[in-house]
């Protein structure tokens, strides 16, 4: 192409060849005249000469010359335009080097050049290329003709079939439609009954055996009861037995109430006429009267806010209420005193262990799919004397609708309640479970309140003891009045309103903006006609906007236009709409139906029914004897009913044929296939043709009755259909049933055709169809009685064919049956054809992973995969139930071929690889479960005195127990034993079986070797398939270890994943950032088991309700002084603390009033505010609160102290401040002083040994008297947060194609728009090369096209479903308001970068960095990030900038007074910098000498310890801190177990993946001020290089040590990692390992016992036992201080007697430091800056670390291999399937696969199950074009896997691309009780963070101290309220 430039620029000459109309460039040449020219050469094929065209840039050709060129045929010259300039032509000029020939008929000069001969090779290459191009075009033409022919043929067939069908149905009328529906649904009903036969059989069996089983086992248990409480304590009984009454036991139904006249009445009779009156009185009265029914009702909403129809469950009895429902208001008489009425009798609710007796409505609902959850879930109980009613949250109704249950807000018309008015917005209601794209009926219900009923709206409150006064209550105004008042009220000056312009607006403003759209256009460029035309369009648009459904229709149109699973080249909107509509109907409705087993079996049932009908109707056919013509049949005697039946069956056949034609991939092949021809013949087309050929005016001919026997042949393929539908049947049964059906099909087909050809034969009495069926049986069995022989030639030929067929048929089928009975199965399913669209999987894929992959595809990417072909060496039989569950619940066709390793040879799978869409090579991630070598059990002894040189202690193959069992019956001679050898042999046997011997000599049970072997086999398969496919097919490789990572990447594999490395990388990040692995895994998983969820929530609430009743019974017992022998005390010291105040839980030691002396001065109000807790129970268990009381080893250090946030990502142990907290700096000083004060407030004699151990225990008693009202708060919070969690669990991560209207949008604006308008989280972008950039806030969408990037970038988005993603991609219009807002943001960005380029000098290059410049210029980073700002960097920022920052955030500062303290501390840090610089040299010299002495003493001490795989083996926790750990300020990480690949975990803990180069430079400067660092000393730098990068001191507690290999050497971690030998199942070993002092605890799924058993289930059981042992240890020491002291005295004997143990471990010298320490503690806080300077200086001089500070709430992570073990943790998880039959087992496997993810233990992110990573394969691009690669996980956790060249880096720099990672930060207290979207926009604009989740702490039971659970809420809704101490998961903004 020409490159036209301006005249000022000279363009270089480009030598181009013109061949076949295409140009190719050559090297540039310069004309001798000096002018730049462009030269083009064209080959004239006729004359074999060159035609050289010259053009000069500065000259133009006249229009006449252009015309002459066009006339002479040289119009192929390409003209290029640049930025819409006028078209320019180049004037041709000669060259002096060439001989010019002038053509008389042309203006072009033909040139003959001598250099042309040298270019013949190049020209020949061009000719070949031209030939190949011609072949491609020819192939395209052939393909176009073929598609056109197939389309026309299909269209002709469809028209012909439909026309013939309509023609035959004209005689029957519209009633035939009813018959068709009856036949279709009747056959489907029969097929459903057949498919569910095992289920119905089980129901019938249980009906007859249920009563006998109950009576049989009723004596073995006592039922659990729930007491219905009443106010009269004297009538209440604590007896477990039901009181003896004549009435039968009441159930969970509506109980009858006793009114004043003691007459019973029914609720249903009296509630309807009094419902509205009762509700109006309920709102007018301040108190409620009467007694409340004991009803299990979920809608425990607030009595002030429940709807009118909910009053059905709340009956208010009054003396003025008569039976007719007349309610008299006696408020003036009654006053404020409630009326006492007689309470009804106590009712007991029994829960049997095998039955749950409930009311009839719930019993019926169990049979149905849905039932009213509102009346069976939660409870209304009166718990106190003041008639305090426990009310549940309104949001339970939201959960009820999500479970597809009827809402209580809509009743039938007989209830006479008007429907609710729907409002578009309600700030108190959370978002729905439905799609957030458009509001549908459920979402409107969630977001609305009634105006007519005057339902009060109140925010969700915390405890009734709330003294904060921050609750939003609205008790005097209805919602409509409040909403009207809010509209008139002036909006608050929020801190983000100046930045955020994307807010919801009224429709009137939108219409006004639309009317004013064209007022700002340039009227000079438009004529009057266009103006009028635009005005008319504007009027039309405004008219359309008034139509309510216009926007919905418009959105639906855009949705279907963009609903193209395959890209389309057409741009016609109507064609795209119809194509999208057909595809949507195909994939959402018809395809689901066509693949359903019910539909497939229904087709076979209709064929069988037609067989019966044919046998009935054929008997009425008559024909003259010996007249064998087909048209001679007389059908007058056939009943008229048969005509309707025949028409019905023909229409059903037409539908089957058209469905098959529509869904076939190769339609031409389908049309001419055997079975489709049979279907076509039996359609009405044959009747239409026969009627046309043989017209009979006398009677009607039913041609379908003549051709009907051919349809019986459809039963031939019934076996394959039944094998896919009745998958619970064995192969032998399927083959037997298939043989029977095939025989019947051949029999009835042969008999029917013979009847049409030969009947009737009166002489031999073969007249009826059954006679010929008898003849068919005789013929097929080859008996040949001779009573009948065919007469016609056609009959004779058919008989011979049937005889030959039966010979071959019987032998082949019997052989196949024998093989199935006696040979293993190697194929399961139907092998896909080469034309099918399938995905090929190779390798020993475990059945569980296959199930996860298919379920992930079905839930996240429905209809994206048609079939899966699996080649596996594992036995096919183990996939039986998984195969059945996949076929039954998805539309995926699956075929499994395997049973041996030879099935995966490249020669066998060659064809399968070539025709596959994508290839997945997977290894066996569950090798321990499916490998026989790991099932061996070896016994070991406790003797560890092993000597490898002793031959008697070596294990030989014959010494292994397993080998002895195998060789038991061999011919080997038995060993003769002597009496003298008994002792020695016994001793040798013990030594042979000890643990170390097994670890050193046995390779059989080494899991690392097994995984390594599997990886090697996987690599071989990859190499073989790579050579077959030649990288043309995308290949995904999954390995366990990362040994062969470089080899795979060098072979250009499409996707690569190492399961073990990814698992340990997630764990390493989660250690620093709580719960991050669970947050990320939620993005790749979408559970859909609503039934299991419902059951789980019901069971959870029943359990909690049981605790409520127990608590109330305990109160009554204490009040009535009744003693019970079975009363369980919660703790040993319960009686001592029974009357203690709840404030004792808030303050660490409430008895010491000295704690409050430090809260003086200006900080008094602030500290009191931070000590406040909305629920007093929280604080005892929360180590992440703002006033954290845990005395960890890092309590006095700024770096380790993350107040209000467990932001352990930034564990930099230098003296800089908290990274993200608003008020963390002032809390830091407060907490440090308070904690150090706690440590010494009772230490009158500090040198006593017991104080260092006992001072942190204090009053840890877990028992306290908790008010009953707190139970309501817990139930309410759990229900609400489970709802929020399940709502966020719907979000998946997808690849997002940006719509055209978003081109030019700033990424930050686009993410804000998508979240606010559509509820989606846009978190990053991804390129075609899989380069991922998270939170690139300065990236402009579509800007890469300006830099000639070939393909546009895609977005990474979190949304609810694939349909919602398509809706977002189909957005066609964005309001002008948003566009203007986006343009304003872009202009600000450009100005900012312009300023940055001017001031690039003078700041050591840091002003070039984007993040630093934004902090200085735009003040986005305020003083809240003091912790990440270095001391030297603080000095650069001037006081003027700090004052500007302070003024900008004054709105938050007014609400949170911690900012005032932050500014003072900021100044203090500025002063400290100058002081530090003065004393720097003196400190360095002092530190050098101290550090050298430390190294010498450490080397002497390490001689005493063993060296195991690079680290030292120590005795206990104290020895490790004294002799091993370099930096003793780091927190402790305890790792239980030592697997083979633990080096992966330590590697990711060591690598500083969370900091950029900027932070590394800061750390070097900060480390220069550290007392242990000396930059001038080489020994110091080398010795501490690895330790500085590790954030923890690590202790590995294990009884086993893996064998050495070249990867697991831990020498790099020897300075901060120690090893303690011992089993983690022993509590003594755990205490030695420092279990009480560990900040983080990881229990790995390795072997923890003496038995070398690698069985996965046993290892998981050990992990569960260790977890419970740890919990029990903490419970014991929290009960009493003495227990803790006794444990310490017993285990740490020497250390306990050492009275200076802390000083000896941490410091080099003496007691002088203690004086400074005491002086520091005695100071109190004042507002004077001088005292603050003293405080900081004293803190920096000496900080005492107590290594025996007990960490009350360590974060524990347990690794579990198999999810089946979770049943022992949470009994509601049902993962055992052995007690079910085959059909139920398949259903249970599918329903429970991965559904454990919503349980409490998983929500708390305490358990990591390896199965969570199984479905990552389903999230890759070959699966769907909307899939995102799972490599995004590495980007989320901060590991940059992108490798860029210099050019690519420059390209990214030009685009302002940046990437970030996930961090956890505290949420400012300003947002407490405010919606989440406010916090989201604040973090987005002010901090440049993208919030994607919330970490929340919830107490699940107030009766236990250790009951706090974490809630990981991913993708929160807009209206979710922020609570205290919530932390946010954000994607931080970093530059590349």
Swiss-Prot record:
Reactions performed catalytically: K(+)(in) = K(+)(out)
Intramembrane residue stretches from the record: 772-788
Stretches that traverse the bilayer: 175-195, 598-618, 643-663, 670-690, 701-721, 734-754, 791-811
Keyword annotations of the record: Coiled coil, Ion channel, Ion transport, Membrane, Potassium, Potassium channel, Potassium transport, Transmembrane, Transmembrane helix, Transport
One GO CC term on file: membrane
Activity regulation as described: Partially inhibited by Ba(2+) and quinine. Probably insensitive to tetraethylammonium (TEA).
Domain of life: Eukaryota
InterPro entries: K_chnl_dom (IPR013099), K_chnl_Slo-like (IPR047871), RCK_N (IPR003148), Volt_channel_dom_sf (IPR027359)
This protein's record includes keyword Ribonucleoprotein: no
Coiled coil location: 1141-1185
Location in or out of the cell: Membrane
GO molecular function: potassium channel activity
Loss of function: phenotype: Decreased uptake of the K(+) congener 86Rb(+) by parasites. Slightly prolonged survival of infected mice. Inhibition of oocyst development in the midgut of Anopheles stephensi mosquitoes.
Keyword Kinase attached: no
Function: Likely a predominant potassium channel in the erythrocytic stages of parasites. Mediates transmembrane potassium transport. Required for the development of oocysts in the mosquito midgut.
Protein name: Potassium channel K1
